[in-house]
Structure formats: structure tokens, C-alpha cells
Amino acid sequence: MFEITSLLGNISRKDSDVYLHAHINFSDESLNVYGGHLVKCYISATCELVVTVLNGTINREFNEEIGLNLFNLN
């Protein structure tokens, strides 16, 4: 059993699809902490989140120069 100790990220759009970029830290029963990018997870009981909604849409585009999907704020 793990407990989420931190979850932070953003939700944007890429090619009209929802794009989640999230970092997670979680601890085990021995108090070891693990972290990294959240790709998939299943919540067995509860997970309390605060989501701040901004006006407009934030899109991502692939940047060939650095090889990452970056915000396009234009």
C-alpha cells in the first residue's frame, strides 16, 4: 500500500487531445519515498485534488530543437 505525499502538474491540450503532465511522490509502509512522472495510477480509496481552471486553452506543440512537447502560449 502506498500513500501519495505530493502530486503536482498541469493539464493542457496537444493535437486537440487532453495532455496530462504530472509529477508524483508516494511513500510505502516503511516510509521510503519514490517519485517521478505519473503515467498511470489506480486509487484504492481517496485522492483529494485541487484543480485551478484558467480562462482559455493551453496547447502544446512538439519542439524539434529540444525534443519536448512545450506550451504554445500564442
What does each model-found stretch correspond to?
Residues 1-38:
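Mid-chain, well-packed structural core segment of small domains
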Residues 17, 36-74:
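Flexible glycine-rich active-site/ligand-binding loops centered on an Asp-His dyad
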